[in-house]
C-alpha cells in the first residue's frame, strides 16, 4: 500500500472518532517498501516511506496514541544504518509505552533450520540492543518510548527439552546485559504438520520465564 493510502485510512479513522491507532497488519515495519523484498534474504529498509507515514499521522493533533506492531530482528541486525533511521522516526512519533514485537520463536539452531525461521539468536541480540539504545528514553507518560517484545513458539519441528534450556540461556544473557523487554509472549504452535509438545516441559519453561525473567524486568 502507498503512504497516501495508509494516511487516508488513518485520517478516516480519526474523523470517525478514533484517537488511538496501531499501525499493524504487517510482519515487519522495517521492510515497508524496502529494497529487494522479493529477491533478497535481508531486504534493505527504506526509511523515507515509513517516516512519511509516521510523521504524517502525527500531524493530526486529534491523534492521541500511535503505536506499531511487528519488526523482524534479522532485518535490523543485517541493515543497522537504514534501520537506525527508521527507529529514530519511531522514537520521535510513537507514544511512549510502544512495543516492537520480535519473533525469534526458538533459540535452538536445529529448530531454526528445520522450520525455516528467519532470525537467529545473535541477530535477535543485536536488534534488542539496538532498540534499547534508542527506546529506553521516557516519554510524556513516564514510560519508555519503545521497547522490544519477544515471541516464542512451542511445538515446532525438531524441538526437544533442551530447546527450552537454550531459550532460557538466551533470556538470562539478555538480563545479564541489562537489556529491557516490554513483554515475552509464549504460545503453542497451531496447525497440522508439527510435533506434539511435552506439556510438563512447556509449563516449566513458562514458569521459569515468568518468575526469573518477567518479574525482575
Where are these regions (language model features)?
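Conserved SAM/AdoMet-binding glycine-rich loop
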Residues: 7-149, 154-159
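Auxiliary Fe-S-binding modules of radical SAM enzymes
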Residues: 61, 135-143, 165-217
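Canonical Radical SAM [4Fe-4S] cluster-binding loop centered on the CxxxCxxC motif
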Residues: 1-5
Amino acid at each position: 500500500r502507498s503512504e497516501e493510502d495508509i494516511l487516508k485510512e488513518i485520517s478516516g479513522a480519526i474523523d470517525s472518532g478514533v484517537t488511538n491507532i496501531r499501525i499493524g497488519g504487517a510482519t515487519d515495519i522495517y521492510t515497508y517498501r524496502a529494497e529487494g523484498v522479493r529477491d533478497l534474504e535481508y531486504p534493505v529498509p527504506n526509511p523515507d516511506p515509513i517516516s512519511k507515514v509516521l510523521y504524517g499521522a502525527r500531524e493530526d493533533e486529534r491523534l492521541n496514541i500511535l503505536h506499531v506492531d511487528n519488526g523482524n530482528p534479522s532485518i535490523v541486525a543485517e541493515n543497522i544504518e537504514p534501520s537506525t533511521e527508521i527507529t529514530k522516526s519511531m522514537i520521535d512519533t510513537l507514544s511512549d509505552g510502544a512495543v516492537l514485537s520480535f519473533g525469534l520463536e526458538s533459540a535452538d539452531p536445529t529448530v531454526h533450520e528445520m522450520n525455516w525461521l528467519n532470525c537467529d539468536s545473535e541477530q535477535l541480540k543485536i536488534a534488542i540492543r539496538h532498540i534499547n539504545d534508542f527506546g529506553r528514553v521516557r516519554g510524556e507518560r513516564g514510560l519508555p518510548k519503545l521497547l522490544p517484545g519477544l515471541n516464542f513458539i512451542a511445538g515446532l519441528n525438531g524441538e526437544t527439552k533442551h530447546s527450552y534450556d537454550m531459550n532460557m540461556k538466551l533470556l538470562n544473557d539478555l538480563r545479564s546485559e541489562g537489556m529491557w523487554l516490554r513483554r515475552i509472549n509464549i504460545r503453542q504452535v497451531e496447525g497440522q504438520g508439527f510435533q506434539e509438545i511435552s506439556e510438563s516441559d512447556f509449563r516449566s519453561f513458562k514458569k521459569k520465564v515468568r518468575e526469573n525473567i518477567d518479574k525482575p524486568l
